[in-house]
Amino acid sequence: VTLNKLSHPRPADLDILLVSPDGTAVMLMSDAGGTAQPANLVSLTFDDSVSVSVPTPLGTGAWKPTDINTGPDTFPVPAPAGPYGATLSAFNGTPAAGTWSLYIFDDDPTGGGTGRLNAGWQLFLTPTL
């Protein structure tokens, strides 16, 4: 999964969730990326084969899904309720055909500022044998 040109003044306020057509959900990023430096047009690729967590400050690159605070994350409807998977391998064996959904939620709207995913997102599927 690649998010293209994400901007937000406090990236650690973001919770990012990917949901497959059958409802399987994986937390890509939560409470990661720091609050001291804004993210400005960073592109993030999430990949289980990468050993590095989302860095602080948030920068362009490939990272493993990272959830810093292991407490429950709550998304507004229509996102599904947790618990959520922690790795993309949670999608193994699930149907790939259908509508995939990406939810990005600012879990601290009092933190100041809003963000934007400026150039959309891409999903790359690798079949398991």
Language model features: what each stretch is:
Residues 1-129:
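Loop and turn regions of beta-sandwich accessory domains that flank beta-strands and are enriched
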